Design a protein with these regions (language model features):
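Helix-to-loop junction immediately C-terminal to a conserved catalytic motif
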Residues: 54
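Conserved catalytic motifs of ABC-family nucleotide-binding domains
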Residues: 158
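Conserved ABC ATPase "signature" region
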Residues: 115-133, 180-184
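ABC ATPase NBD coupling module
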Residues: 70-85, 90, 114-118, 224-231
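Conserved ABC ATPase signature
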Residues: 137-141, 145
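The feature captures the beta-strand-to-loop junction immediately N-terminal to the Walker
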Residues: 39-41
Length: 257
């Protein structure tokens, strides 16, 4: 399966009545098993583009497709039923519910049986090392534990894609490394991952491809090294003095590594 956008355009009304084009003719794609970054400076249009893929924002022009189906006007919950999962930047765990009940609630809403819920919960909590947190309410989890619980809940419905909004925000370097390993592991199992994040190094080090937006338009596309060496990207996004030695290193394959 593939998610793709064609020539997305979005404008917003400014003070004084003028309209500003915040996304201008943006086309991106994401296939299953691929990790793709959507990056750029503040105000570049990356978040608006991301939200149009998610279904939170409707484009003024252009279309969003899942394979050959036009899903541009499809609400988020219907996109979810077609296999497009979404993790928001803000905490989305139900704070008073246990980790197990967080997973159970989502699966019940999607028509899974009690037996399926029990089996799937066991698999996910073992995979994401959440066994000892099963009965703990979401409100007492640390940032990294919460992220893993949110991922477990998103995976419970067996999506083909997961769209991650600022997944590396608010967590420490060790937890970032664990999360990177989880993301690469999901991709190796055929799940497509789209990431938008301000943490450039954490994102570029695990992506297969990246789109860089500046002033509402894509100025570059490619793998990590191409992005880091692109003169326009360095000028308008990374900065001329940007340095990072040893481009792609080994990323743990799971949270236990």
């Amino acid at each position: 399966m593939i998610i793709r956008t064609e020539h997305l355009v979005k404008t917003y009304k400014q003070k004084g009545g003028d309209r500003k084009r915040v996304v201008n003719d943006v086309s991106v794609s994401l296939t299953q098993g691929e990790v793709v970054g959507l990056l750029g400076p503040n105000g570049a249009g990356k978040t608006t583009t991301f939200y149009m893929v998610v279904g939170l924002v409707r484009p003024d022009e252009g279309r969003v497709f899942l394979d050959d189906e036009d899903i541009t006007r499809l609400p988020m919950y219907k996109r979810a039923r077609r296999g497009i999962g979404y993790l928001a930047q803000e905490s989305s765990v139900f704070r008073r519910l246990s980790v197990a009940d967080n997973i159970k609630l989502v699966m019940e809403q999607n028509g899974f049986s009690s037996a399926q819920i029990k089996a799937r919960t066991q698999v996910l909590t073992e995979e994401l090392h959440l066994e000892k947190f099963l009965d703990k309410p979401g409100g007492v989890l640390s940032g990294g534990e919460r992220r893993r619980a949110e991922i477990a809940r998103a995976l419970s419905t067996e999506p083909a894609f997961i769209l991650l909004d600022e997944p590396f925000t608010g967590i420490d370097p060790v937890t970032i490394e664990e999360l990177q390993g989880i993301i690469r592991n999901l991709a190796s199992r055929g799940i497509g991952i789209l990431i938008t994040d301000h943490n450039v190094d954490a994102t570029l080090s695990i992506t297969d491809r990246n789109y860089i937006l500046v002033d509402a338009q894509i100025i570059a596309e490619g793998p990590e090294q191409d992005i880091r060496e692109n003169e326009r990207v360095r000028k308008f996004y990374l900065g001329e003095g940007y340095r990072r030695e040893g481009l792609r290193g080994e990323v743990p394959s799971s949270a236990s590594d």
